[in-house]
């Protein structure tokens, strides 16, 4: 598979599925670490919650997918290293993206954006970015449209 095709596929898959995986882990984190009653509030506003996660997470997820697609063959063919780089890259890219948005005051004008992007809610950004980066790096070779056949990545064990 050509590098440009792999970059397009990885970027799109990460952008579409990454924020959704992040929301799943964030909801589980809120349910187990915080009060379970907050989960009822989140379920009531789930469409808005998904929209916010996609608007704040799609671009960092896409950039993480492009980064994973551009990994050298030695690193990209090994599951552990690909997941490690995907997770760390997801966190770093998300934090850089949020720092840029905070400095652009027009985009961060609403109270909801300012609350999400504030330093107090660092765990709300780091956990979904880390876990979505790791999970997407792990399953990216199994998604349709990618002709990656590497013995190291073909088994899910």
Swiss-Prot record:
Name used for this protein in its record: Inner membrane protein CbrB
This protein's GO CC annotations: plasma membrane
Q: Give yes or no: UniProt keyword Iron.
A: no
Q: Which residues lie on this side of the membrane: Periplasmic?
A: 33-36, 105-115
User: Which keywords are on file for this protein?
Assistant: Cell inner membrane, Cell membrane, Membrane, Transmembrane, Transmembrane helix
* Cytoplasmic topological domain: 1-11, 58-83, 137-157
Indicate where this protein resides in the cell. Cell inner membrane
Q: Which domain of life is it from?
A: Bacteria
Topological category with respect to the lipid bilayer: Multi-pass membrane protein
The text of the family note is: Belongs to the CbrB family.
Q: Which organism is it from?
A: Escherichia coli O6:K15:H31 (strain 536 / UPEC)
> Which residue ranges run through the membrane?
12-32, 37-57, 84-104, 116-136
Q: What is its main location?
A: membrane
């Amino acid at each position: 598979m050509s590098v440009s095709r792999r970059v397009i596929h990885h970027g799109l898959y990460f952008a579409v599925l990454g924020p959704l995986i992040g929301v799943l882990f964030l909801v589980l984190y809120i349910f187990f670490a915080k009060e379970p009653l907050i989960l009822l509030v989140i379920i009531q506003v789930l469409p808005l919650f998904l929209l916010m996660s996609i608007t704040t997470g799609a671009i960092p997820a896409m950039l993480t997918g492009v980064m994973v697609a551009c990994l050298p063959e030695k690193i990209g063919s090994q599951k552990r290293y690909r997941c490690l780089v995907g997770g760390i890259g997801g966190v770093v890219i998300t934090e850089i993206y949020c720092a840029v948005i905070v400095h652009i005051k027009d985009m961060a004008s609403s109270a909801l954006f300012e609350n999400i992007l504030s330093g107090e809610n660092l765990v709300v950004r780091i956990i979904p970015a880390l876990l979505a980066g790791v999970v997407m790096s792990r399953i990216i070779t199994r998604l349709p449209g990618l002709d990656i056949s590497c013995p190291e990545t073909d088994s899910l064990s």
